[in-house]
């Protein structure tokens, strides 16, 4: 008959189960076939290594652009190249002024869309110089779109940039840059998701004592197929 009765330990175990105090087995790790978390910071750390070939391309472009702008504007322009920045696209877009001329660009044969950004101060500075000014008088930027005349000059400037940038890339990789469309707001120029890693460079231009910036931005996924070339140097 004693086998029909529960021991004190068994009674205690049942009471814990009813009250919700029963010990639960500790997880032994995620199942091999279950979903795995992905740390976006991991990609960022991988990308952050130096890309010496891209640095040389940028330096070469800065030299070529100076000559190209002189031929286009018949004015001397000084320019300098900033360091390559690796960051999330949301961080890059957050630092852009509004309105800004955002130019979506195909870089064939690479897959994806690059972004060339002309700060409004650059556009107005070039327009002023094209019409005989010296860039000392600043046009109000906020609250208006670019005029038809300004858009034509932007296209001319973009042609110079495309020509000289392709020339700078040619010893490394033969790229052809093609205009897709322009936007004024970064919300409509999403070349990448907000959390996706992008690689960008800022070029500072100076006309007669006035400064303006131009930015070139690639999604990392776009240049990843040629990453070995960018690491190697030439």
Where on the chain are the PLM-derived regions?
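N-terminal auxiliary interaction/assembly segments of multi-subunit proteins
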Residues: 1-234
